Structure formats: structure tokens, C-alpha cells
Amino acid sequence: MKSKIIVALLIMNMVISASAQNQNQYGLVYRDAVSENVVGKVNIHPVSYEVGGIGVVANIYTPANYDSSKEYVAIVVAHPNGGVKEQVAGLYAQRLAELGYITIAADARYQGASGGEPRNTDRPANRIEDIHGMVDFISQYPGVDASRIGALGICGGGGYTLGAAQGDKRIKAVATLSMFNSGRVRRNGFQDSQINT
């Protein structure tokens, strides 16, 4: 009997979660996500561009009362390994826009809604290029002060963001959140376990 109740609760939870996700026209999955563009609030603008000949799909978040004739600091937000722009990267992009920044969260190439084959691959050099591509795109966005661009990398995106900032002087500030350096782990093993072997 208990197992039937547990199964029923799990099914009900999946249905409710799927229903909640379908209610958001942008596919955002976090609480209080932008669900429609409203004057005087943070708005979301789906965009697309190319990096290395492959289509990239992104969301730009503009602050409440955005005025393209003003100059705003911009922040690129890199998602975790295996993540997509609708998850934690979108949450941070929205919260930063609520603080007055213009932000961009993009699906890395080969992942999410962006193009590229084979799917669901995560190569450090590509992810670093993707961050450069976000900087390229956001620096041309109306209202962005291209001399004031920052970057936030989450989990694996944190390591890639540090790599991108090393070679891109347009990125003036970097922050990471729960950073994981995939490149270092691939070279040296987890916690540098392969260095002395």
C-alpha cells in the first residue's frame, strides 16, 4: 500500500512540474521567473546568433524601465556543465537584471536549443568560445556600455568563465558560483589525483 501511495505522489509531482514548466512561455523553470514582458519590470528577449558557424540561442534580460538610450553594465552568465539557459543561469541572469544590469544567458553550442552535433557534448575550448560569443553579442546590444562587461560562471561554467576572461580584455570583472574547473580535472584528475602517477 505504501509503495502505491509513493508512486502516486511521484506521478502527481511530475505532472504538476510539467504543467508549471508549460505555463512559462520562455520555458523557465525557477520560482518567480519572468513569464511575460511587462512595462516597468524585468523583461526577457529571446535572441539567436552564431559562434563558429553554429547557431546559439540565448535570452537577454533587461532591467525594469530599461531605456536603450542609457548605458548599462552587462553581465554574461555561463551555465553549468549539462545545464541550459532556462535553469540556474536564467535565475541569476534575472536576479542581476532586477539589480539594474543587462544580462545574457545562452545555451552552449551542442546543448539545449543551440545547434551543433553531436548533442550534449561539453568541450572546454568550445565553452570558452561560447562565452566570447556572448560577450560579442551583448556588447552590441542597445544600451550596453561595452567598456563595462562582467561575467558570472556557475559550476563548470565558472571554470570556463575564468578561461574566457584570461583571453578577453573586454571582461572587466569575473565571479564564479560553486565553480568546477572541468579542464583541470580532465588534465590532472579529480582533486589533482593524476599529477604524480
Show where each model-derived region lies.
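Alpha/beta-hydrolase active-site loop
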Residues: 121-142
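Alpha/beta-hydrolase fold nucleophile elbow
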Residues: 142-155
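Alpha/beta-hydrolase-fold enzymes
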Residues: 150, 160-197
